């Protein structure tokens, strides 16, 4: 009996619906050409949900996600909802509750410098020409963003604010296992990021990561202090395979990795739990300034579908096909405005059409 692949589709706000339309083109190719039993159902989330239902994450949307095997997420937020109380705004009202409800403890951000796009990188050509293929594995539900106590104190003599970095053993163990398991599917290198020369939580982090590493004899483990890591990523990003990071350090370094690729419109991401249920989304935001102009880059969303095939559905060959189609499209010189070095570029829908056609032709030849 063929397996069903149920996907909850949440286009959201801004450019979300536009790039999601291009994602549907890829899913239709997978259904028609590979006979995958992919079923999609669309739900409101973010600002559009606030306008319709008064909340960013309606019960119907949450139930739809529960009934699915994975979530394909567009983008949320925009100026229209910025004046709402912070807990009601699209990001805090939808994305954070989804992460919490499904226990999405790991965030995977993929950063690549694609062949032919080296000049887009802010790095010197002698560095960018060496390439970059970094998978940043960030712990997502612990650390200083969630530790207690936190707050502020006001007095006549001295005002202060404070946060607490707390990591439990099980939190470090599960994200370490995730990083090492992923490294086995790549180049078998893990670089763990900490500040173990100063922070107790980082000393604890390093101790546990070292212990977990003994279960993965094929994977080479190294450690870097976060300040040195930030420098090394700029000096020679090609040396890295998998970065294993705490919540705070991963938040910072994943954005640094994104910057060196030249465009955030190329960067997919995944947030996973221990059952391989995942939320897949482009790394960029809702870009309300270009909403409706048909100029957004859909590649990050399309590559997010590839990550879904790889990590939630374990369809590795399908994921490779999607990656190949995107690579081929870029090698042929097709560009959206954000990655074009001149005035020659194609729009959102054309980019989706071309990638879908190249994917279909590739499948036909197999």
UniProtKB/Swiss-Prot annotation:
GO terms for biological process: L-leucine biosynthetic process. Signal peptide: none annotated. Substrate binds at residues 99, 109, 138, 227. One of its GO terms (cellular component) is cytosol. SMART domains: Iso_dh. Mg(2+) binds at residues 227, 251, 255. It is found in: Cytoplasm. Its EC number is 1.1.1.85. It is an enzyme of class 1 (oxidoreductase). GO terms for molecular function: 3-isopropylmalate dehydrogenase activity; magnesium ion binding; NAD binding. It comes from the Bacteria. Keywords: Amino-acid biosynthesis, Branched-chain amino acid biosynthesis, Cytoplasm, Leucine biosynthesis, Magnesium, Manganese, Metal-binding, NAD, Oxidoreductase. NAD(+) binds at residues 78-91, 285-297. Binds 1 Mg(2+) or Mn(2+) ion per subunit. It catalyses: (2R,3S)-3-isopropylmalate + NAD(+) = 4-methyl-2-oxopentanoate + CO2 + NADH. Its cofactor is Mg(2+); Mn(2+). The keyword Oxidoreductase applies. The record marks 145, 195 as: Important for catalysis. Pfam families: Iso_dh. Pathway: Amino-acid biosynthesis; L-leucine biosynthesis; L-leucine from 3-methyl-2-oxobutanoate: step 3/4. Catalyzes the oxidation of 3-carboxy-2-hydroxy-4-methylpentanoate (3-isopropylmalate) to 3-carboxy-4-methyl-2-oxopentanoate. The product decarboxylates to 4-methyl-2 oxopentanoate. Homodimer. Belongs to the isocitrate and isopropylmalate dehydrogenases family. LeuB type 1 subfamily. This is 3-isopropylmalate dehydrogenase. It comes from Buchnera aphidicola subsp. Baizongia pistaciae (strain Bp).
